Amino acid sequence: MCTLFKRQVEHRPVEQILINTSREETRVAILDDGLLQDLFIERACARGLVGNVYWGQVVRVLPGMQSAFLDVGLERTAFLHIAEIEGARMDTGTFKPIESLLHEGQRLMVQVAKDPIGTKGARLTTTISLAGRKLVYLPNDSHIGVSQRIEDAALREELRTLATTVRQKDEKGGYIVRTCAEEGATEQEFLSDMAYLARLWDGIRHRAQEVKKPTLLYQDLTLAQRTLRDMVHEGCLLYTSPSPRDRSVSRMPSSA
């Protein structure tokens, strides 16, 4: 395994991650040197929808609002604006008329970008993105980018070069290097992410071919699973009660 880089830090607080799961809720506490820094709670009855991928059907197109409502199998129809439709923006910067892209009864794959609020349904996008540990996969794009939160220009170029080198020449889709790669990234970590995300996307596509009506194709990871993916790193102390890892590992990159 060849490490691209590893930042040196003179003193790094001992980080502790505590995960407590029950049927009702999951609680995650982040501590630095024993001091609470963050507390996250996810209730089973109110789990968010952001990141979920659905097979939806257009039920109404509104040219005046340049938007559409889709049935995705939820209690309320979901909202899709023209700006969230891939391929809708023209070279001039303006958008194609939504009625030229969508029609009632049309079926398409969408992802939740914003949870329902009050009487408003979920907001959708057709730009599908799937997150791994170090990379975000964009199956309908070919671009390789780097998180804008990584500001070091030289580091950004190193990460982009690594992702470009590792990606298979005939591989479809693009990637965005996640902010967490700023602390260190290896070729093997990128390869592991790419393999995991390719399997995940294949599963979603195959399910979309099988379903006959609007339905959920992929549910995003739970709070416990996201914590294992995003926050656990070398040197941190992890405490779980009970352990969520056995239930999570099948949906995580092999490097997790």
Task: Annotate each language-model stretch with its function.
Residues 1-241, 251:
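Single-stranded RNA-binding surfaces
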Residues 245-246, 250-256:
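Positively charged, low-complexity/disordered segments
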